[in-house]
Structure formats: C-alpha cells, structure tokens
C-alpha cells in the first residue's frame, strides 16, 4: 500500500509552478460547508469543519491549478430546512461550491435545490461536493450531474463488509440497528440483500430503527439485542448514536461483534475505550495507520487541534478540485464539473476515479478492527491507547457496485 502512495507535496508544488500562466492562478475558490455545529452531532461537525479548513490551507500551498481555497462554515443544525437557508446564504455571498455530508436527508434536499437553481440560473451554476452522505440513491435514481460523491456509498461499503463476513463461520445471528432516516434504511436493506446472497444461513434475529441524534440511552436496545441471541450487530450509526450505543454495550455486558461504518468518528473511540478489543469492525475508505503523507498530516492535525483527522474524503475533494481546475483552466463550475466528470487522479489511497456514469468516486476500502495500538499501528484516536488495525483491503474493482443512473448532462 505504501508504494501506491507515491505523490508528495513537493511534486504538487512543481505542478503549480508549471501552470503559473493559467488564467485561474491566484483566484480564490470559496466552498460553503453546510453541516451541524450545534446539537448532539456538533462534535462531528466541528471536527470536519476543522478538517476542511486545514486541508484548504494545505492545498492552497500546492495545487496544480494555482488557486487559493477558502472554506466558509455554516451551521445547518442537521436540518434540511436550515440547510436550504444556508445554501441561499452561500449563494448570496457568491459562493459556487458547496459541501455537506452529515445526514442523507439533508443531502437529498440540497441535491434537489442545486438542480433547480442551476436549471433556472444559467451562468450561476453551483457544484455539490458530497463528503459523507452515503445513500446509494444519490448516484442511482436521484443522480445529478451537479452532485459528486467522494465517500463510498452504502452499497459499496456493505459489499465489502459482507464479503469479509461471508468467510466468518462464527457469525450466525445478526441484529440490524440503524437510524430512522434514508441512510439507516439503506444500511438495513443492503445488509439483508448481501447476506441473503452470500450467507443465506445467517439469521436476521432482530431489526430496529431509532430517531436520528435524539436517543441518549441505548440500554433498552442492548437488552433487546442480548435477548435475541445475536452474535453480531450491523449498524450504520454515527456520532453520538454510535458512541452511546457502544457505551451501552460495554455497560450492559454485550460481547458480540459490531460491524460499523463510523467507529473512528468523534466520541466513539472514547466510548469504546479498552472495550470491544477485537470485536468492533469498521469499513471505510481510510484508516488511522496509512503511513506516508497521510500520517504526517494526521500528526500535524492532532498537534494543532488536539483532535483526530478521519474524514479522508476532504483530501479527495481538494485533490480532485485542483486537478479538475487545472484541466479546465478555469474555476467556473460548469467547466470544472465537465473536468471532474470521469476524472482519474491521485489521492491518499492511490488512483481514484470519479465515475462518469454516476459521479460516485471509485476507491479502495479498508476493513479495520478496534484493538491495542502497537509499533506497527501506532496511531491512537482520542488518546485511548487503542487503534483501528487494518484487516483487509478491498481494491476499487471489488468495492465497486453497478449503477442505474441515467446521467443528464446540461445542454
């Protein structure tokens, strides 16, 4: 894996110098970040805003288009309605790029709003850079030319997760516990479909949906899981909804496995602590011990903010924008969207591709397990002494899933 991470900041700096004659050099590209800075999910939002601002600095120093990046944070309170107000505020400031990721219900509202705006306002188009909203519909039935997803969607993550689970004969009874909105529904749907195809002998012994970012005590859910006899829980929960779930599991003495998407996200490492050793798994497009430039960035981020960097899609976004703007020789969203469409470029996990068919980034995925940090895997999130150790890598061709998207490019 280390050999694949061949790109460095000095190389990118050379690229900047080589393109200094281009028209867009020195332009400031503003990105409106629309995500929660209040409520139960505020710690996640705060971490991700810092991540965007940190990498705006890094990529302003060195990107092949020679542009300056600036991130403007707007609190959406995890609300679709507030997000539409935030979008209008961004447009009023002349911002042409937006990013969001926490809550697929929010992302869906933004996709619709961006589509309508771009159709009605030629010459003032906006691009939606989706960093973390993973509902597969956004690159299938609801796909949009103006929407680009840099995370891996639920169908991709569940394809990889269940490929691993298929070989584990000790997994016999599974409980599905998810948040009651589109993301949670899709996690449950794809878990059932994949397990039925790959391991029809596995029993789904229980299924629950709970309100997003409202539950403060998951003990009743843990009691139901224990009573069901489940040896494994699959959950797409994130933020406080995962941190409080694993805390309740530790306190309630549940010793089964958890297969998650977001163990590394703010609050969950602390909630797990020494508990869950060898039993809590995460499927993601990055992990804490990737080495190379990523390790240097993580160390600098931790030193500056006393916090952990875990949203690698931020890097995908800035790397992709830099290459697309260099290719387009412009910061105009219409030209940049055309350049991003099908773009192959280098990011922290090697070559990635923004698939033309649906604007879903094709990238490797990593299955990791919560365990004690060691010399080979030294990074310890939230100073727990624990880490997410890589178990299996799924290259892009394995994690890739088909799409039903009928992409409509603008006239």
List each language-model region with its residue ranges.
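Immediate post-signal peptide segment of exported/extracytoplasmic ligand-binding proteins
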Residues: 21-33, 62-68, 166-172
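Extracellular/periplasmic periplasmic-binding protein-like sensory domains
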Residues: 144, 246-318, 326-331, 374, ...
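Beta-alpha junction/loop-to-helix N-cap segments that form part of ligand/metal-binding clefts
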Residues: 28, 43-47, 58, 62-138, ...
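Extracellular/periplasmic Venus flytrap/periplasmic-binding protein
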Residues: 81-85, 136-137, 145-253, 287-296
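Extracytoplasmic "Venus flytrap"
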Residues: 28, 32-53, 74-81, 102-103, ...
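Short, low-complexity disordered leader/linker segments with a strong preference
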Residues: 1-30, 92, 404, 408-411
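Short, charged, surface-exposed loops that flank catalytic or proteolytic processing sites
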Residues: 65, 326-339
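Periplasmic-binding protein-like
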Residues: 90-104, 121-131, 173-178, 229-239, ...
């Amino acid at each position: 894996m280390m050999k694949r991470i061949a790109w460095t900041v000095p190389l990118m700096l050379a690229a900047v110098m080589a393109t200094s004659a281009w028209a867009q050099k020195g332009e400031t590209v503003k990105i409106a970040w629309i995500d929660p800075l209040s409520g139960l999910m505020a710690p996640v939002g705060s971490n991700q805003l810092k991540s965007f601002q940190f990498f705006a600095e890094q990529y302003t120093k060195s990107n092949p288009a020679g542009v300056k990046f600036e991130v403007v944070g707007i609190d959406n309170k995890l609300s679709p309605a507030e997000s539409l107000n935030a979008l209008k505020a961004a447009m009023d400031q002349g911002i042409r790029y937006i990013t969001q990721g926490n809550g697929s219900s929010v992302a869906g509202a933004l996709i619709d709003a961006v589509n309508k705006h771009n159709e009605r306002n030629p010459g003032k188009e906006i691009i939606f850079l989706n960093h973390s909203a993973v509902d597969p519909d956004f690159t299938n039935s609801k796909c949009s030319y103006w929407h680009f997803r840099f995370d891996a969607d639920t169908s991709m993550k569940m394809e990889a997760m269940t490929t691993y689970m298929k070989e584990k004969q000790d997994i016999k009874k599974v409980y599905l516990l998810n948040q009651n909105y589109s993301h949670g529904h899709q996690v449950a749907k794809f878990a059932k479909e994949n397990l039925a195809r790959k391991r029809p002998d596995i029993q789904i012994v229980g299924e629950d949906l709970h309100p997003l970012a409202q539950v403060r005590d998951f003990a009743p859910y843990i009691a139901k899981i224990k009573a069901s006899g489940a040896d494994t829980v699959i959950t797409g929960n994130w933020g406080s909804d995962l941190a409080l779930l694993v805390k309740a599991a530790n306190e309630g003495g549940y010793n089964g496995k958890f297969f998650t998407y977001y163990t590394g996200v703010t609050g969950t490492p602390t909630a797990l602590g020494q508990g869950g050793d060898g039993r809590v798994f995460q499927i993601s497009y990055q992990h804490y011990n990737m080495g190379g430039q990523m390790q240097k960035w993580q160390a600098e981020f931790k030193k500056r903010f006393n916090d952990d960097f875990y949203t690698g899609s931020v890097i995908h976004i800035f790397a992709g924008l830099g290459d697309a703007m260099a290719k387009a020789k412009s910061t105009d969203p219409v030209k940049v969207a055309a350049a991003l469409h099908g773009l192959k470029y280098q990011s922290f996990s090697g070559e990635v591709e923004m698939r033309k068919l649906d604007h879903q980034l094709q990238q490797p995925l990593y299955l990791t397990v919560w365990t004690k940090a060691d010399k080979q895997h030294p990074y310890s999130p939230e100073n727990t002494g624990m880490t997410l150790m890589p178990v299996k890598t799924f290259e892009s061709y394995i994690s890739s899933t088909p799409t039903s998207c009928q992409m409509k490019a603008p006239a």
